[in-house]
Amino acid sequence: MMFGGYETIEAYEDELYREESSSELSVDSEVEFQLYSQVHYAQDLDNVIREEEHEDRNSGNSESFSSKPNQKNLIVLSDSEVIQLSDGSEVITLSDEDSIYRCERKNFRVHAKEKTQGSPASLHSNDLADKKCKRDIEKSKPGERSGTIQEVMIIEVSSSEEEESTISESDNVESWMLLGCEVDDKDDDILLNIVGCEKSVNEGEDDVNWFISDKDIEAQIGNKRSSGRWTHRYYTANKNVTCRNCDKCGHLSKNCPFPQKVRPCCLCSERGHLQYACPARFCLGCSLPMSSTHRCLERASWRKRCDRCDMIGHYADACPEIWRQYHLTTKPGPPKKPKTPSGQSTLVYCYNCGQEGHYGHECTERRMFNQTFPTSPFIYYYDDKYKIRERDQRIKRKVKELQKNGDLPRKFKRPHMEAADKRPRDIRTSHASWKNNRWPQEKKETQKETMSRNMREREKHRKAARCHEDDEDFPRGPRVHSTPGTSKTQKPHKPFHHSSHYLKPREDRLSKEGKRGKHKKKESCVGEDSNDNLFLIKQRKKKSKL
Protein backbone atom coordinates (compact mmCIF):
# COMPACT_ATOMS: atom_id res chain seq x y z
CA MET A 1 0.00 0.00 0.00
CA MET A 2 2.99 2.24 0.39
CA PHE A 3 3.60 2.50 -3.38
CA GLY A 4 -0.03 2.71 -4.49
CA GLY A 5 -0.56 -1.02 -4.97
CA TYR A 6 2.77 -1.67 -6.68
CA GLU A 7 5.18 -4.22 -5.30
CA THR A 8 8.39 -2.27 -5.63
CA ILE A 9 9.37 1.33 -6.00
CA GLU A 10 10.82 0.59 -9.43
CA ALA A 11 7.45 -0.54 -10.74
CA TYR A 12 5.86 2.57 -9.24
CA GLU A 13 8.41 4.77 -10.98
CA ASP A 14 7.90 2.95 -14.29
CA GLU A 15 4.19 3.63 -14.12
CA LEU A 16 4.67 7.21 -12.95
CA TYR A 17 7.17 8.12 -15.65
CA ARG A 18 5.55 5.82 -18.26
CA GLU A 19 8.66 3.79 -18.87
CA GLU A 20 8.51 0.36 -20.46
CA SER A 21 11.11 -1.16 -18.18
CA SER A 22 13.53 0.01 -15.52
CA SER A 23 16.16 -2.61 -16.16
CA GLU A 24 18.32 -0.30 -18.23
CA LEU A 25 20.04 1.92 -15.69
CA SER A 26 22.61 3.18 -18.16
CA VAL A 27 20.26 5.81 -19.57
CA ASP A 28 19.66 7.32 -16.12
CA SER A 29 23.36 7.35 -15.32
CA GLU A 30 24.18 9.05 -18.61
CA VAL A 31 21.49 11.66 -18.06
CA GLU A 32 22.78 12.31 -14.57
CA PHE A 33 26.36 12.58 -15.82
CA GLN A 34 25.45 15.07 -18.53
CA LEU A 35 23.32 17.16 -16.22
CA TYR A 36 26.00 17.40 -13.56
CA SER A 37 28.72 18.11 -16.12
CA GLN A 38 26.96 21.32 -17.16
CA VAL A 39 26.55 23.09 -13.83
CA HIS A 40 25.72 26.77 -13.93
CA TYR A 41 26.38 29.01 -10.96
CA ALA A 42 23.89 31.82 -10.48
CA GLN A 43 24.50 34.97 -8.45
CA ASP A 44 21.53 37.27 -9.06
CA LEU A 45 18.75 34.74 -9.39
CA ASP A 46 16.11 37.11 -8.06
CA ASN A 47 16.76 39.68 -10.77
CA VAL A 48 16.88 37.03 -13.52
CA ILE A 49 13.63 35.43 -12.38
CA ARG A 50 11.93 38.81 -12.25
CA GLU A 51 13.08 39.60 -15.80
CA GLU A 52 11.78 36.26 -17.06
CA GLU A 53 8.44 36.76 -15.33
CA HIS A 54 8.17 40.24 -16.80
CA GLU A 55 8.89 38.91 -20.30
CA ASP A 56 6.42 36.06 -19.80
CA ARG A 57 3.76 38.56 -18.83
CA ASN A 58 4.46 40.67 -21.90
CA SER A 59 4.20 37.63 -24.14
CA GLY A 60 1.05 36.53 -22.34
CA ASN A 61 -0.74 39.80 -23.05
CA SER A 62 -1.23 38.78 -26.70
CA GLU A 63 -3.22 35.65 -25.85
CA SER A 64 -4.99 34.15 -22.88
CA PHE A 65 -3.56 30.94 -21.55
CA SER A 66 -5.46 28.18 -19.81
CA SER A 67 -3.64 25.82 -17.44
CA LYS A 68 -4.60 23.50 -14.64
CA PRO A 69 -2.82 24.43 -11.38
CA ASN A 70 -3.21 21.09 -9.66
CA GLN A 71 -2.11 18.97 -12.62
CA LYS A 72 1.15 17.15 -12.00
CA ASN A 73 4.15 17.17 -14.30
CA LEU A 74 4.38 14.17 -16.60
CA ILE A 75 7.86 13.13 -17.66
CA VAL A 76 8.16 10.80 -20.68
CA LEU A 77 11.36 8.78 -20.96
CA SER A 78 11.96 6.41 -23.86
CA ASP A 79 14.74 5.01 -25.99
CA SER A 80 13.63 7.16 -28.88
CA GLU A 81 15.17 10.46 -29.75
CA VAL A 82 12.84 12.79 -27.80
CA ILE A 83 12.17 13.18 -24.05
CA GLN A 84 9.25 15.48 -23.30
CA LEU A 85 7.97 17.28 -20.23
CA SER A 86 4.27 17.95 -20.69
CA ASP A 87 2.59 20.74 -18.68
CA GLY A 88 5.84 21.41 -16.80
CA SER A 89 8.38 24.16 -16.65
CA GLU A 90 11.09 22.54 -18.79
CA VAL A 91 11.43 20.08 -21.68
CA ILE A 92 14.73 18.19 -21.91
CA THR A 93 15.72 16.57 -25.22
CA LEU A 94 18.63 14.13 -25.40
CA SER A 95 20.12 12.51 -28.49
CA ASP A 96 23.14 10.34 -29.20
CA GLU A 97 23.59 11.31 -32.83
CA ASP A 98 25.62 14.49 -33.05
CA SER A 99 29.11 15.41 -32.03
CA ILE A 100 29.32 17.79 -29.06
CA TYR A 101 27.86 18.66 -25.71
CA ARG A 102 25.48 21.50 -26.39
CA CYS A 103 22.84 23.18 -24.37
CA GLU A 104 20.00 25.43 -25.42
CA ARG A 105 17.02 26.67 -23.44
CA LYS A 106 14.09 28.09 -25.35
CA ASN A 107 10.71 29.39 -24.34
CA PHE A 108 8.00 28.15 -26.70
CA ARG A 109 4.38 27.16 -26.64
CA VAL A 110 3.44 23.53 -26.07
CA HIS A 111 -0.06 22.38 -26.99
CA ALA A 112 -1.96 20.07 -24.74
CA LYS A 113 -2.33 17.22 -27.22
CA GLU A 114 0.51 17.76 -29.68
CA LYS A 115 3.82 16.00 -29.97
CA THR A 116 7.11 17.63 -30.84
CA GLN A 117 7.95 17.14 -34.46
CA GLY A 118 11.33 16.88 -36.03
CA SER A 119 14.52 15.35 -34.81
CA PRO A 120 16.77 17.20 -32.33
CA ALA A 121 19.65 16.84 -34.76
CA SER A 122 17.86 19.07 -37.26
CA LEU A 123 17.17 21.68 -34.57
CA HIS A 124 20.87 22.21 -33.84
CA SER A 125 22.63 21.38 -37.07
CA ASN A 126 23.46 25.04 -37.77
CA ASP A 127 24.66 25.87 -34.20
CA LEU A 128 27.58 23.46 -33.64
CA ALA A 129 30.18 26.24 -33.21
CA ASP A 130 28.45 28.07 -30.33
CA LYS A 131 30.45 28.40 -27.09
CA LYS A 132 27.85 29.36 -24.50
CA CYS A 133 24.32 28.41 -23.56
CA LYS A 134 21.87 30.69 -25.31
CA ARG A 135 18.48 31.71 -24.07
CA ASP A 136 16.01 32.73 -26.80
CA ILE A 137 12.44 33.74 -26.17
CA GLU A 138 10.07 33.32 -29.05
CA LYS A 139 6.69 34.90 -29.07
CA SER A 140 3.81 32.67 -30.01
CA LYS A 141 1.60 33.30 -33.03
CA PRO A 142 -1.90 34.70 -32.43
CA GLY A 143 -3.57 31.82 -34.33
CA GLU A 144 -2.22 29.05 -32.09
CA ARG A 145 -4.24 27.21 -29.51
CA SER A 146 -4.14 27.95 -25.79
CA GLY A 147 -1.22 26.38 -23.91
CA THR A 148 1.61 27.09 -21.46
CA ILE A 149 5.00 28.75 -21.88
CA GLN A 150 7.80 26.31 -21.15
CA GLU A 151 11.57 26.02 -21.40
CA VAL A 152 13.31 23.40 -23.49
CA MET A 153 16.85 22.23 -22.70
CA ILE A 154 18.41 20.15 -25.46
CA ILE A 155 21.66 18.32 -24.77
CA GLU A 156 23.45 16.54 -27.59
CA VAL A 157 26.02 13.89 -26.80
CA SER A 158 28.98 13.21 -29.04
CA SER A 159 29.76 9.78 -30.40
CA SER A 160 33.49 10.21 -31.07
CA GLU A 161 36.00 11.08 -28.36
CA GLU A 162 38.28 13.06 -30.72
CA GLU A 163 35.60 15.55 -31.70
CA GLU A 164 34.62 15.88 -28.07
CA SER A 165 38.16 16.82 -26.97
CA THR A 166 38.71 19.34 -29.79
CA ILE A 167 35.37 21.10 -29.48
CA SER A 168 35.42 21.15 -25.67
CA GLU A 169 38.63 23.19 -25.78
CA SER A 170 37.01 25.68 -28.11
CA ASP A 171 33.92 25.88 -25.89
CA ASN A 172 35.96 26.64 -22.73
CA VAL A 173 34.83 23.37 -21.16
CA GLU A 174 37.62 22.49 -18.76
CA SER A 175 38.27 19.19 -17.08
CA TRP A 176 37.13 20.49 -13.70
CA MET A 177 33.64 20.96 -15.10
CA LEU A 178 33.26 17.21 -15.66
CA LEU A 179 32.69 14.78 -12.83
CA GLY A 180 35.52 12.45 -11.90
CA CYS A 181 38.35 14.53 -13.38
CA GLU A 182 41.47 15.58 -11.53
CA VAL A 183 42.73 19.11 -10.95
CA ASP A 184 44.64 20.54 -13.89
CA ASP A 185 47.24 23.32 -13.99
CA LYS A 186 45.31 25.02 -16.76
CA ASP A 187 42.29 25.50 -14.52
CA ASP A 188 43.54 28.92 -13.44
CA ASP A 189 42.05 30.59 -16.50
CA ILE A 190 38.51 29.41 -15.89
CA LEU A 191 35.50 31.25 -17.19
CA LEU A 192 32.66 30.36 -14.90
CA ASN A 193 29.10 30.28 -16.18
CA ILE A 194 27.89 32.73 -13.56
CA VAL A 195 24.66 34.57 -14.13
CA GLY A 196 25.04 38.25 -13.35
CA CYS A 197 28.87 38.24 -13.36
CA GLU A 198 30.71 38.08 -16.67
CA LYS A 199 34.23 38.50 -15.26
CA SER A 200 36.83 35.79 -14.90
CA VAL A 201 38.46 34.82 -11.63
CA ASN A 202 42.02 35.69 -12.61
CA GLU A 203 41.28 39.34 -13.31
CA GLY A 204 42.96 42.07 -11.31
CA GLU A 205 42.16 42.43 -7.65
CA ASP A 206 40.75 45.90 -8.23
CA ASP A 207 38.11 44.50 -10.60
CA VAL A 208 36.84 41.72 -8.35
CA ASN A 209 33.57 42.50 -6.58
CA TRP A 210 34.34 41.15 -3.12
CA PHE A 211 31.83 41.44 -0.30
CA ILE A 212 33.10 43.51 2.69
CA SER A 213 31.68 43.17 6.16
CA ASP A 214 29.78 46.14 7.53
CA LYS A 215 31.85 46.12 10.72
CA ASP A 216 35.08 46.37 8.70
CA ILE A 217 33.65 49.28 6.74
CA GLU A 218 32.71 51.12 9.93
CA ALA A 219 36.09 50.49 11.57
CA GLN A 220 38.08 51.48 8.45
CA ILE A 221 41.07 49.42 9.54
CA GLY A 222 44.03 49.72 7.19
CA ASN A 223 46.65 47.02 6.77
CA LYS A 224 50.28 47.68 7.54
CA ARG A 225 51.94 49.21 4.51
CA SER A 226 55.40 48.27 3.33
CA SER A 227 56.79 51.80 3.11
CA GLY A 228 57.64 53.41 6.42
CA ARG A 229 56.62 56.95 5.48
CA TRP A 230 52.92 56.05 5.38
CA THR A 231 52.85 55.11 9.05
CA HIS A 232 54.12 58.53 10.19
CA ARG A 233 51.57 60.58 8.30
CA TYR A 234 49.41 62.69 10.57
CA TYR A 235 46.68 63.27 7.98
CA THR A 236 45.66 59.66 7.40
CA ALA A 237 41.99 59.06 6.70
CA ASN A 238 41.44 56.29 9.27
CA LYS A 239 41.09 58.36 12.42
CA ASN A 240 38.46 56.40 14.36
CA VAL A 241 40.76 53.58 15.56
CA THR A 242 42.81 54.15 18.72
CA CYS A 243 46.13 52.39 19.24
CA ARG A 244 46.58 50.76 22.65
CA ASN A 245 50.34 51.14 22.49
CA CYS A 246 50.75 54.88 21.86
CA ASP A 247 47.13 56.03 22.50
CA LYS A 248 46.97 57.73 19.10
CA CYS A 249 44.26 57.42 16.46
CA GLY A 250 44.65 56.05 12.97
CA HIS A 251 46.21 52.60 13.44
CA LEU A 252 46.16 49.47 15.59
CA SER A 253 48.74 48.36 18.13
CA LYS A 254 50.14 45.70 15.76
CA ASN A 255 50.84 48.42 13.16
CA CYS A 256 52.21 50.93 15.68
CA PRO A 257 55.55 52.48 14.61
CA PHE A 258 56.63 53.00 18.23
CA PRO A 259 58.21 50.20 20.30
CA GLN A 260 55.86 48.03 22.30
CA LYS A 261 55.21 48.95 25.90
CA VAL A 262 56.59 46.85 28.72
CA ARG A 263 53.96 44.73 30.39
CA PRO A 264 52.92 46.20 33.78
CA CYS A 265 52.84 44.38 37.11
CA CYS A 266 49.46 43.01 38.12
CA LEU A 267 49.95 43.97 41.80
CA CYS A 268 51.19 47.57 41.72
CA SER A 269 50.49 48.48 38.04
CA GLU A 270 54.08 49.66 37.58
CA ARG A 271 56.23 48.78 34.56
CA GLY A 272 59.69 47.31 34.75
CA HIS A 273 58.99 44.24 36.85
CA LEU A 274 56.46 41.43 37.11
CA GLN A 275 54.48 39.92 39.96
CA TYR A 276 57.22 37.77 41.48
CA ALA A 277 59.72 40.67 41.62
CA CYS A 278 57.25 43.28 42.87
CA PRO A 279 58.27 45.17 46.04
CA ALA A 280 54.59 45.36 47.06
CA ARG A 281 53.84 41.64 46.89
CA PHE A 282 52.06 40.12 49.86
CA CYS A 283 52.07 36.79 51.65
CA LEU A 284 49.31 34.38 50.70
CA GLY A 285 49.15 33.02 54.24
CA CYS A 286 48.86 36.16 56.36
CA SER A 287 48.10 38.73 53.60
CA LEU A 288 50.90 41.01 54.84
CA PRO A 289 53.49 42.72 52.62
CA MET A 290 56.48 40.52 52.06
CA SER A 291 60.05 41.60 52.74
CA SER A 292 63.43 39.93 52.88
CA THR A 293 63.01 39.11 56.59
CA HIS A 294 59.33 38.21 56.48
CA ARG A 295 58.24 35.08 58.30
CA CYS A 296 54.64 33.96 58.08
CA LEU A 297 53.32 32.99 61.52
CA GLU A 298 49.81 32.13 60.37
CA ARG A 299 48.53 28.61 60.10
CA ALA A 300 48.28 26.92 56.75
CA SER A 301 45.16 27.78 54.81
CA TRP A 302 43.92 24.19 54.69
CA ARG A 303 43.88 24.19 58.50
CA LYS A 304 41.69 27.28 58.77
CA ARG A 305 37.94 26.94 59.08
CA CYS A 306 35.48 29.81 59.12
CA ASP A 307 32.91 29.93 61.94
CA ARG A 308 30.60 32.04 59.78
CA CYS A 309 30.23 30.09 56.52
CA ASP A 310 31.88 26.80 57.64
CA MET A 311 34.30 26.83 54.69
CA ILE A 312 38.00 25.91 54.70
CA GLY A 313 40.72 28.44 53.90
CA HIS A 314 39.96 31.50 56.05
CA TYR A 315 38.72 32.73 59.42
CA ALA A 316 35.53 34.62 60.23
CA ASP A 317 37.16 38.08 60.14
CA ALA A 318 38.35 37.45 56.55
CA CYS A 319 35.16 35.80 55.28
CA PRO A 320 33.98 37.01 51.84
CA GLU A 321 30.45 37.06 53.23
CA ILE A 322 31.36 40.32 55.04
CA TRP A 323 31.44 42.32 51.81
CA ARG A 324 28.82 40.15 50.09
CA GLN A 325 26.17 41.13 52.66
CA TYR A 326 26.19 44.73 51.35
CA HIS A 327 24.49 43.81 48.06
CA LEU A 328 21.35 45.81 48.99
CA THR A 329 23.03 48.64 50.92
CA THR A 330 23.28 52.08 49.31
CA LYS A 331 23.87 54.29 52.39
CA PRO A 332 26.59 54.26 55.07
CA GLY A 333 25.75 52.19 58.08
CA PRO A 334 24.89 48.56 58.84
CA PRO A 335 23.97 46.34 55.88
CA LYS A 336 20.38 46.35 54.71
CA LYS A 337 18.51 43.08 55.10
CA PRO A 338 16.05 41.79 52.49
CA LYS A 339 12.38 41.69 53.46
CA THR A 340 11.87 38.14 52.23
CA PRO A 341 14.59 35.48 52.27
CA SER A 342 15.82 34.66 48.78
CA GLY A 343 15.28 31.03 47.83
CA GLN A 344 17.65 28.94 45.76
CA SER A 345 16.99 28.67 42.05
CA THR A 346 15.80 25.41 40.54
CA LEU A 347 18.53 25.44 37.87
CA VAL A 348 21.80 24.63 39.61
CA TYR A 349 25.06 24.29 37.63
CA CYS A 350 28.68 23.84 38.63
CA TYR A 351 31.33 26.26 37.35
CA ASN A 352 34.09 23.69 37.89
CA CYS A 353 32.81 20.60 36.04
CA GLY A 354 29.86 22.13 34.16
CA GLN A 355 27.36 19.53 35.36
CA GLU A 356 23.87 20.16 36.66
CA GLY A 357 22.71 19.50 40.20
CA HIS A 358 25.34 21.15 42.43
CA TYR A 359 27.25 24.41 42.88
CA GLY A 360 30.91 25.05 42.29
CA HIS A 361 31.92 25.11 45.97
CA GLU A 362 30.26 21.70 46.44
CA CYS A 363 32.08 20.02 43.55
CA THR A 364 34.23 17.01 44.48
CA GLU A 365 36.22 16.84 41.24
CA ARG A 366 39.67 18.30 40.70
CA ARG A 367 39.88 22.09 40.74
CA MET A 368 41.07 24.13 37.79
CA PHE A 369 43.03 26.47 40.12
CA ASN A 370 44.50 25.05 43.34
CA GLN A 371 45.95 28.25 44.86
CA THR A 372 42.71 29.29 46.57
CA PHE A 373 39.87 27.46 48.27
CA PRO A 374 36.26 27.75 47.06
CA THR A 375 33.81 29.97 48.93
CA SER A 376 30.07 29.84 49.38
CA PRO A 377 28.01 32.26 47.24
CA PHE A 378 25.25 32.56 49.85
CA ILE A 379 24.78 34.89 52.86
CA TYR A 380 24.08 33.03 56.08
CA TYR A 381 23.34 36.08 58.28
CA TYR A 382 23.68 39.88 58.24
CA ASP A 383 25.78 41.79 60.76
CA ASP A 384 24.36 44.53 62.99
CA LYS A 385 26.25 47.60 64.22
CA TYR A 386 27.47 45.86 67.40
CA LYS A 387 29.10 43.00 65.52
CA ILE A 388 30.67 45.42 63.07
CA ARG A 389 32.12 47.43 65.98
CA GLU A 390 33.51 44.30 67.64
CA ARG A 391 35.17 43.18 64.40
CA ASP A 392 36.80 46.61 63.93
CA GLN A 393 38.16 46.51 67.48
CA ARG A 394 39.65 43.06 66.92
CA ILE A 395 41.36 44.25 63.74
CA LYS A 396 42.81 47.32 65.52
CA ARG A 397 44.20 45.19 68.34
CA LYS A 398 45.83 42.88 65.83
CA VAL A 399 47.42 45.82 64.00
CA LYS A 400 48.87 47.16 67.25
CA GLU A 401 50.38 43.78 68.06
CA LEU A 402 51.98 43.58 64.63
CA GLN A 403 53.40 47.09 64.95
CA LYS A 404 54.75 46.31 68.40
CA ASN A 405 56.49 43.17 67.20
CA GLY A 406 57.79 44.87 64.05
CA ASP A 407 56.00 42.44 61.72
CA LEU A 408 54.08 45.22 59.98
CA PRO A 409 56.53 47.10 57.71
CA ARG A 410 56.20 50.62 56.40
CA LYS A 411 53.57 51.36 53.81
CA PHE A 412 54.76 50.88 50.24
CA LYS A 413 54.62 54.04 48.13
CA ARG A 414 54.50 54.06 44.36
CA PRO A 415 56.82 56.43 42.46
CA HIS A 416 54.02 58.55 41.04
CA MET A 417 52.47 58.88 44.51
CA GLU A 418 55.78 60.07 45.95
CA ALA A 419 56.07 62.71 43.22
CA ALA A 420 52.57 63.93 44.06
CA ASP A 421 53.48 64.20 47.74
CA LYS A 422 56.38 66.54 46.92
CA ARG A 423 54.05 69.22 45.57
CA PRO A 424 53.74 72.42 47.71
CA ARG A 425 50.81 72.35 50.09
CA ASP A 426 49.56 74.36 53.01
CA ILE A 427 52.12 74.58 55.80
CA ARG A 428 49.66 73.93 58.57
CA THR A 429 48.05 70.86 57.01
CA SER A 430 51.37 69.40 55.92
CA HIS A 431 52.84 69.96 59.39
CA ALA A 432 49.85 68.29 61.08
CA SER A 433 49.90 65.31 58.71
CA TRP A 434 53.68 65.13 59.08
CA LYS A 435 53.32 64.77 62.83
CA ASN A 436 50.51 62.20 62.67
CA ASN A 437 52.08 59.92 60.06
CA ARG A 438 55.48 59.49 61.74
CA TRP A 439 56.46 56.33 63.55
CA PRO A 440 57.75 56.40 67.20
CA GLN A 441 61.38 56.05 66.11
CA GLU A 442 61.16 59.11 63.90
CA LYS A 443 59.35 61.17 66.53
CA LYS A 444 62.46 61.30 68.69
CA GLU A 445 64.49 62.80 65.86
CA THR A 446 61.84 65.40 65.14
CA GLN A 447 61.68 66.38 68.80
CA LYS A 448 65.43 67.01 68.85
CA GLU A 449 65.19 69.19 65.76
CA THR A 450 62.36 71.27 67.22
CA MET A 451 64.28 71.74 70.49
CA SER A 452 67.35 73.03 68.64
CA ARG A 453 65.22 75.47 66.62
CA ASN A 454 63.61 76.86 69.77
CA MET A 455 67.02 77.37 71.39
CA ARG A 456 68.27 79.34 68.37
CA GLU A 457 65.24 81.61 68.38
CA ARG A 458 65.69 82.32 72.08
CA GLU A 459 69.33 83.31 71.57
CA LYS A 460 68.32 85.71 68.80
CA HIS A 461 65.75 87.37 71.04
CA ARG A 462 68.33 87.76 73.81
CA LYS A 463 70.80 89.47 71.47
CA ALA A 464 68.10 91.83 70.24
CA ALA A 465 67.18 92.76 73.82
CA ARG A 466 70.84 93.52 74.66
CA CYS A 467 71.17 95.83 71.67
CA HIS A 468 67.99 97.62 72.68
CA GLU A 469 69.41 98.24 76.18
CA ASP A 470 72.62 99.67 74.70
CA ASP A 471 70.61 102.14 72.61
CA GLU A 472 68.81 103.35 75.67
CA ASP A 473 72.06 103.87 77.59
CA PHE A 474 73.84 105.67 74.72
CA PRO A 475 71.27 107.65 72.65
CA ARG A 476 72.45 108.86 69.23
CA GLY A 477 69.49 111.02 68.24
CA PRO A 478 67.49 113.90 69.68
CA ARG A 479 64.76 113.07 72.10
CA VAL A 480 61.28 114.13 71.13
CA HIS A 481 59.61 116.40 73.67
CA SER A 482 56.12 115.30 74.42
CA THR A 483 53.47 117.95 74.11
CA PRO A 484 50.84 118.23 76.81
CA GLY A 485 48.03 117.66 74.30
CA THR A 486 49.31 114.27 73.14
CA SER A 487 49.32 111.38 75.52
CA LYS A 488 51.01 108.95 73.12
CA THR A 489 54.74 108.47 73.40
CA GLN A 490 57.00 107.60 70.54
CA LYS A 491 58.50 104.15 70.71
CA PRO A 492 62.26 103.86 70.39
CA HIS A 493 63.55 102.80 66.99
CA LYS A 494 64.51 99.17 66.70
CA PRO A 495 67.93 98.38 65.34
CA PHE A 496 68.34 97.35 61.70
CA HIS A 497 69.74 93.96 62.55
CA HIS A 498 66.64 92.84 64.49
CA SER A 499 65.47 89.34 63.58
CA SER A 500 61.83 90.31 63.21
CA HIS A 501 62.76 92.68 60.35
CA TYR A 502 63.57 89.79 58.05
CA LEU A 503 60.41 87.87 58.81
CA LYS A 504 58.07 90.66 57.64
CA PRO A 505 57.04 90.93 54.00
CA ARG A 506 58.75 93.31 51.63
CA GLU A 507 55.85 95.75 51.19
CA ASP A 508 55.59 96.36 54.94
CA ARG A 509 59.32 97.00 55.09
CA LEU A 510 59.18 99.59 52.30
CA SER A 511 56.25 101.43 53.86
CA LYS A 512 57.95 101.54 57.23
CA GLU A 513 61.21 102.78 55.74
CA GLY A 514 59.30 105.66 54.13
CA LYS A 515 57.77 106.54 57.47
CA ARG A 516 61.20 106.49 59.06
CA GLY A 517 62.44 109.05 56.54
CA LYS A 518 59.58 111.38 57.41
CA HIS A 519 60.27 111.01 61.11
CA LYS A 520 63.94 111.88 60.55
CA LYS A 521 63.00 115.09 58.76
CA LYS A 522 60.76 116.10 61.61
CA GLU A 523 63.48 115.34 64.11
CA SER A 524 65.95 117.49 62.15
CA CYS A 525 63.53 120.39 62.24
CA VAL A 526 63.12 120.01 65.96
CA GLY A 527 66.89 119.84 66.41
CA GLU A 528 67.40 123.16 64.67
CA ASP A 529 65.09 124.86 67.08
CA SER A 530 66.71 123.37 70.14
CA ASN A 531 70.49 123.73 70.38
CA ASP A 532 70.87 120.87 72.86
CA ASN A 533 72.54 118.36 70.50
CA LEU A 534 75.84 119.91 69.23
CA PHE A 535 76.99 116.71 67.52
CA LEU A 536 74.21 116.89 64.94
CA ILE A 537 74.94 120.52 64.17
CA LYS A 538 78.57 119.77 63.38
CA GLN A 539 77.54 116.95 61.02
CA ARG A 540 75.22 119.26 59.08
CA LYS A 541 77.98 121.84 58.61
CA LYS A 542 80.33 119.21 57.21
CA LYS A 543 77.66 117.99 54.74
CA SER A 544 76.97 121.54 53.57
CA LYS A 545 80.67 122.17 52.88
CA LEU A 546 80.95 119.05 50.82
From Swiss-Prot:
UniProt keyword annotations, A-Z: Isopeptide bond, Metal-binding, Nucleus, Repeat, Ubl conjugation, Zinc, Zinc-finger
Subunit structure of this chain's protein: Component of a nucleolar TRAMP-like complex, an ATP-dependent exosome regulatory complex consisting of a helicase (MTREX), an oligadenylate polymerase (TENT4B or TENT4A), and a substrate specific RNA-binding factor (ZCCHC7 or ZCCHC8). Several TRAMP-like complexes exist with specific compositions and are associated with nuclear, or nucleolar RNA exosomes.
Pfam families linked to this entry: zf-CCHC
GO cellular component, one term: nucleolus
Location(s) in or outside the cell: Nucleus, Nucleolus
Main location: nucleus
Single annotated GO MF: RNA binding
PANTHER family membership: ZINC FINGER CCHC DOMAIN-CONTAINING PROTEIN 7
Alphabetized InterPro entries for the sequence: TRAMP_AT-DNA-binding, Znf_CCHC, Znf_CCHC_sf
Species for this entry: Bos taurus (Bovine)
Stored SMART domains: ZnF_C2HC
Protein name as annotated: Zinc finger CCHC domain-containing protein 7
Gene that produces this protein: ZCCHC7
